[in-house]
Amino acid sequence: MNSAFFEELKARGLVYQVTDEEALQKQLNEESVKLYIGFDPTADSLHIGHLLPILMLRRFQQNGHVPIALVGGGTGMIGDPSFKDAERSLNTLDTVKAWSESIKGQLSRFIDFEDEKNPAILANNYDWLGELSLIDFLRDVGKNFTINYMMSKESVKRRIETGISYTEFAYQLLQAYDFLKLYETEGCLLQLGGSDQWGNITSGIELLRREQEVQGFGLTMPLITKADGTKFGKTEGNAVWLDAEKTSPYEFYQFWINTDDRDVVKFLKYFTFLTLDEIATIEEEFTANPGQRAAQKALAKEVTTLVHGEAAYHQAVKISEALFSGDIQSLTAEEIKQGFKDVPTYEVQPEDQLSLVDLLVTSKIEPSKRQAREDVQNGAIYVNGERRQDLAAELTETDKIEGQFTVIRRGKKKYFLLKY
C-alpha cells in the first residue's frame, strides 16, 4: 500500500475529521481496506455535490483499497435530517427504486467494478432494511443506543427547536446498521462522508464496537464553501447534475470555467487527479497572470473530461469559443441546443413572414416594427453572428443551421433562438 496516500489526502484538504487517525493510517498502510460511502437517491441523477465523495472512492481504489458504493434504496425512503432545516418529503418505493438504478449507472463511470485486483462493490441498503422487522430493529440496533446519546448529535440538536419526526430521528440508527451489515458481509471497516455525516458515522462505529467488538473508522470531508458565500453546486439556483440530459456538458464546463479566483486552486486539489506538483505549477502561472485563467481552464478541462469524456470537453470548448467570437455558423444543431438552452426561443410557424423585420416582432425579440427597423439600420441585429442591416432582408434556408435553428443577437449580448 502507498504509505504517502493519507498524507496526500490531507495535503489536498480532503480530510476534515477522522477517528483514531494513527490507527487508521496504520491499517491503510498495511492492508487493502474496504470502505464505503452512502448515496441516498433523492433524484434520478447525482449532482456535483456528490462529486467529492465519489472521487474519494476513486482515490482509495487507485491506491489499492476496495470502495463500496452504497445506494440508499432503503434510507432514501426516509431522508437524512443531518443539517436540514425541515422534514423531507417521503418518496414512493417505485420512485426510489428507479432513482437507485440511475445512480448505479452513474457511479460505474467513476469507480471500476471490474478491476482484477480490487474491484469496487455496489450495494443497496434496501436489500437488508427492506427485510428488517421493527422487532428485530429495536432488539438488535435500538438497544445499543440511549436517547441521550442520540440527542447529543449536532444534526439532531439543530432540529429539536423546530421539531423532528421519530422517522428522521431514527435515521442515524439505520445508517449505523448499514455499517454493521457491510462489516458482517464485506469486512468493511471505514465509512466516509461529508462533514454533516459525522454524527451518523460515529453511531455506526459505536454499533460495530458493541455488536462485533471491532474498531471501525470514520473520515469526513470538508463542507465545500465558495468564497462569494453562494452555495456550491448550484448555478443560477439550479443544481448542476452529472447527467448530460439534465445539465449539458457545455453548462457543466461553464460552471467550472467560471470558478472564482479565490476558489480555483482549492477546487483543483479537491476535484482533479493532477498531482500536487502539477497544481503548484498551474498556481504559479495563474498567480503571475490571472487574466489568462490558466487555473480555471485546467479545472474545467479535468472535471468535464472526467465526468463527460474528452469529446464532450472539446465540444464544450468549441461552443464557448464560438459564442465568444460570434462564429455561430461553425456550430452544429446539437451544439446550438447546448449553448443556447436557456435563451428565449421562438418556434417559427409555417404562416410566419420570413422578412427579418417581421420575424423580430413576431418572435418578440423587438417590441415594434419601428424599433426593429431602427435596430437593423443601426447594425444592432446579428443573424448567426453576421450583422444584417438590410431592411428588406429575408431569412433563407442558408440562415437555418442544419434546417433547425437561427441564432439572433441584439446588441452585444442579448441572444435569441428561432427554432424551425
Swiss-Prot record:
GO biological process: tyrosyl-tRNA aminoacylation
Main location per the UniProt record: cytoplasm
S-S bonds: none
Motif 'KMSKS' region per record, residues: 231-235
Species per Swiss-Prot/TrEMBL record: Enterococcus faecalis (strain ATCC 700802 / V583)
Enzyme nomenclature, EC number: 6.1.1.1
GO cellular component: cytosol
Catalysed reactions, semicolon-separated: tRNA(Tyr) + L-tyrosine + ATP = L-tyrosyl-tRNA(Tyr) + AMP + diphosphate + H(+)
Function summary: Catalyzes the attachment of tyrosine to tRNA(Tyr) in a two-step reaction: tyrosine is first activated by ATP to form Tyr-AMP and then transferred to the acceptor end of tRNA(Tyr).
Subcellular location per the Swiss-Prot or TrEMBL entry: Cytoplasm
Biological classification of the source: Bacteria, Bacillati, Bacillota, Bacilli, Lactobacillales
Keywords, alphabetical: Aminoacyl-tRNA synthetase, ATP-binding, Cytoplasm, Ligase, Nucleotide-binding, Protein biosynthesis, RNA-binding
Protein name: Tyrosine--tRNA ligase 2
UniProt-listed NCBIfam families: tyrS
Database matches in SMART domains: S4
InterPro entries, per database record: aa-tRNA-synth_I_CS, aa-tRNA-synth_Ic, Rossmann-like_a/b/a_fold, S4_RNA-bd, S4_RNA-bd_sf, SYY-like_C, Tyr-tRNA-ligase, Tyr-tRNA-ligase_bac-type
Coiled-coil regions listed: none
Residue window of motif 'HIGH' region: 41-50
Residues the entry annotates as binding L-tyrosine: Y36, Y171, Q175
HAMAP family to which the protein is assigned, alphabetical: Tyr_tRNA_synth_type1
Family: Belongs to the class-I aminoacyl-tRNA synthetase family. TyrS type 1 subfamily.
List of residues binding ATP: K234
The keyword rRNA processing belongs to this UniProt entry's keyword annotation: no
Quaternary state and interactors: Homodimer.
